[in-house]
Every structure is written in structure tokens, then in C-alpha cells.
Amino acid sequence: MLKQKALVDVLGQVNTSGVDGSWLFNKEGLLLAYVGSEQKAVASNVSSALIASVWAALERRANDLKETILVLENGVIGCTLVARTMLLAVKADKSADLGMVRAKLHTLAAYLEQPILSISHDLG
């Protein structure tokens, strides 16, 4: 079972070295957990809905989309698929090394894959 407190703790572990936000949400944009800085112009649930919308648009064009990096004027957002049904995103500032952002994203996704699969198996 995936507990909310444990999920928040795990998401918070990647928020170092320029990474200042991490989200876990479904493909429709429904936010399950967010950990990040308090200085944000857009609410985390709105951000997850926007990222999910961008993902859906990209997924229509690419048949087997697994990851995307969005380069923004104030940083980057990396997003990847977890357990076929969930999206994991991390936001980093401009100074963050893109390779480190991707490494954190992939490591966190791999760590969350099995717990999320077991939950979806229990529900389905």
C-alpha cells in the first residue's frame, strides 16, 4: 500500500540541487501528491492539469511517449510515465543540470513503479 506521507517523503527526496518541485498525478491531471517550494505563481493542481494536457497532446503525435522535457523561460519540467497510468514530473530552475534532472526523474519513477502497479492491480 502506498501511504500519502510516505509518498510525499519520497517525492521530497529529489528536491535538491536545483530541483524545486515534484508531482505525481494521473493522465487526466488529477494530483495525487506534490512537494515543492511555496513560491509558486500557479497552484500545484493547476500545474498537474496543464502538464497532463501537454502530455496528452504530445502522446497523440508520438505513439510510444515515455518522457518529455519542457524548457520554460524560468527552468525546465521533466515528465515521465509511471506504471502506464500515472505521470511523474519534476521542475528545476535554469541553473540545474539537465542530466541530473533526468536521472532524478528516472530514479524516482523506477522506485514508484512497483507500488503504483500493485495499487492499480488491487483496484482493477
Curated annotation (Swiss-Prot):
SMART domains: Robl_LC7
Upper classification of the organism: Eukaryota, Metazoa, Ecdysozoa, Nematoda, Chromadorea
InterPro entries: LAMTOR2-like, Roadblock/LAMTOR2_dom
Biological process annotations from GO: cellular response to amino acid stimulus; positive regulation of TOR signaling; protein localization; regulation of cell growth
Entry similarity comment: Belongs to the GAMAD family.
Gene Ontology, cellular component aspect: Ragulator complex
Subunit comment: Part of the Ragulator complex.
Name under which the protein is recorded: Ragulator complex protein LAMTOR2 homolog
Organism per entry: Caenorhabditis elegans
Domain of life: Eukaryota
SUPFAM superfamilies: Roadblock/LC7 domain
Role, per record: Regulator of the TOR pathway, a signaling cascade that promotes cell growth in response to growth factors, energy levels, and amino acids. May activate the TOR signaling cascade in response to amino acids.
Gene Ontology molecular functions: guanyl-nucleotide exchange factor activity; molecular adaptor activity
